[in-house]
């Protein structure tokens, strides 16, 4: 069959691109391993504390039947993934092989991609950020609104954080309730905003792709059960799979269980060569247009391999990320309400120390349903004492994670290695920050920690989960490639050297702002899909 378009990838970008193409009456196929786990659907629709008291099957989703929810040692990328979410990357080492000594990304093989476990925070990029990314001429405002309409966003129009994080989206749901811990922090900040403002920081409720009101008959308002890291929670958190499942069968085909290996642009059609992950059978699918939404790292793998550019280096962008567990003194000895959601409660930005731009973007989580053992294993204390301390501090623990901007340098790149016909090429990653970048990040971390202390949230550590730990990847097929001019994105988001291959994810970006990229990935995918429709 000759499809109008094939979308490779089912994640944050792929879901939105497929939706826009199908809505335009195109016949669309999606190629993706699309592995899924229904463990999340076995979790009773009850509050976390009640499940801990009464559910005899809680082991299966809290720590896993094979203890897979207990990391063996250290902090690794994806450590926050609970057993019901670990299918996201299960088997990726075989399906998406890589080599590195410096960069160990989370590579998804699941239905929904990384969107099957994302944090749901949604931010808009401003004109200066879009300019640096290579999207200076793009008006994303209507696409941001369309993405919000499709995903379901809850936002507080009066939040101080909006000035840098949320502009131009008029329609959204009311804000979510925040938990007791966050309320105490926000109350202290609002009593004297100058404490943070003089340090170049803002703080407030942030937009979240979590429903505060029912969306339709399937996706319902978040019940504040504090089980969001485990179950589907009435589908209240947007996942790409929920959107994909609504696409009409007469115009959309999910070619699940397939691993795209390479493509060929023949001028009047594109051939997508894939392998069935279970049977090993090779297949070729045909379409007039191809939209790469495999995620920046895998889109680059496919494109380099398909163009025969073995050994050619291309940039990597990835937000550096640090999180700081803190003790909120206002909550010591206080009880916290049980009714809360598990995701980020508050957030804000940290301005550049030498300009007015945003250098860091942070979110605050309470430490409740992720279980104390994950905290105890990071404490420099004997386990019994660590447990006692953790129980004492539990309601007062506030985890602040901060992301920093990233830009191209000579020491951040990937390349594909030679491979036999019909095999997935190995990607070699190398990601090393320059001394200047490291120094700047440390200065901003110190100022950030000072701001937290002014809120009476005292850091008890600083954790670096690794150079791929933010799980924010972009910039691998940039508009401007400093490594090799042959491998880049054209201004219309087609892949250089092809006529019918479009880049629908974050691979073309020249720069990665500190703000979470997922909401802009959604909007950009809708924009690129519109171009595909216009060319069809």
Name every feature range the model reports, one short phrase each.
Residues 376-458:
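C-terminal catalytic lobe of FAD-dependent flavoproteins
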Residues 35, 47-84, 289-296, 300-400, ...:
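Mid-to-C-terminal "cap/lid" subdomains and adjacent gly/pro-rich loops that border
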Residues 55, 62-84, 98-100, 104, ...:
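Conserved redox-cofactor binding core of oxidoreductases
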């Amino acid at each position: 069959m000759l499809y109008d378009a094939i979308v490779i990838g089912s994640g944050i970008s792929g879901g939105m691109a497929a939706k826009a193409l199908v809505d335009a009456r195109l016949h669309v196929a999606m190629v993706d391993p699309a592995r899924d786990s229904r463990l999340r659907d076995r979790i009773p629709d009850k509050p976390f504390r009640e499940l801990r008291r009464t559910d005899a099957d809680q082991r299966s989703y809290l720590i896993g039947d094979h203890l897979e929810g207990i990391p063996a040692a250290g902090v690794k990328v994806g450590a926050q993934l609970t057993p019901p979410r670990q299918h996201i990357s299960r088997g990726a080492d075989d399906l998406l092989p890589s080599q590195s000594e410096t960069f160990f990304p989370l590579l998804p093989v699941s239905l929904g991609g990384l969107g099957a476990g994302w944090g749901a925070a949604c931010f808009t990029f401003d004109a200066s950020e879009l300019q640096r990314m290579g999207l200076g001429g793009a008006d994303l405002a209507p696409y941001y609104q369309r993405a919000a309409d499709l995903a379901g966003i809850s936002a507080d129009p009066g939040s101080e954080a909006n000035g840098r994080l949320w502009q131009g989206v008029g329609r959204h749901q009311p804000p979510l309730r925040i938990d007791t811990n966050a309320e105490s922090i926000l109350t202290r900040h609002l009593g004297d905003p100058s404490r943070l403002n003089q340090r170049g920081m803002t703080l407030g409720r942030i937009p979240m792709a979590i429903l505060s009101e029912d969306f339709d008959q399937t996706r319902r308002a978040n019940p504040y059960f504090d089980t969001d890291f485990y179950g589907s929670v009435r589908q209240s958190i947007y996942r790409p799979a929920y959107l994909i499942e609504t696409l009409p069968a007469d115009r959309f085909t999910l070619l699940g269980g397939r691993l795209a290996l390479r493509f060929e642009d023949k001028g009047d059609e594109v051939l997508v060569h894939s392998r069935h992950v279970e049977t090993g059978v090779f297949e070729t699918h045909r379409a007039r247009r191809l939209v790469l939404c495999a995620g920046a790292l895998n889109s680059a793998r496919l494109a380099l391999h398909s163009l025969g550019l073995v050994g050619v280096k291309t940039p990597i962008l990835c937000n550096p990320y640090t999180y700081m567990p803190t003790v909120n003194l206002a909550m010591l000895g206080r009880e916290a309400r049980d009714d809360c959601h598990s995701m980020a409660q508050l957030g804000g930005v940290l301005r550049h120390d030498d300009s007015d731009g945003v250098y860091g973007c942070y979110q605050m989580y309470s430490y409740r349903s992720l279980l104390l053992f994950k905290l105890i294993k990071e404490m420099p204390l004997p386990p019994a004492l660590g447990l006692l301390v953790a129980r004492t501090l539990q309601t007062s623990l506030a985890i602040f994670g901060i992301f920093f901007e990233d830009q191209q340098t000579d020491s951040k790149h990937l390349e594909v290695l030679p491979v036999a016909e019909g095999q997935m090429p190995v990607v070699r990653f190398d990601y090393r920050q320059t001394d200047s970048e490291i120094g700047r990040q440390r200065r901003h971390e110190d100022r950030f920690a000072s701001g937290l202390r002014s809120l009476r949230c005292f850091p008890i550590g600083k954790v670096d989960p690794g150079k791929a730990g933010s799980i924010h990847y972009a910039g691998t097929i940039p508009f401007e490639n400093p490594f090799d001019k042959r491998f880049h994105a054209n201004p219309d988001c087609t892949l250089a050297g092809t006529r019918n291959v479009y880049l629908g994810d974050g691979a073309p970006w020249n720069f990665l702002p500190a703000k979470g990229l997922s909401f802009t990935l959604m909007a950009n995918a809708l924009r690129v899909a519109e171009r595909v429709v216009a060319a069809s």
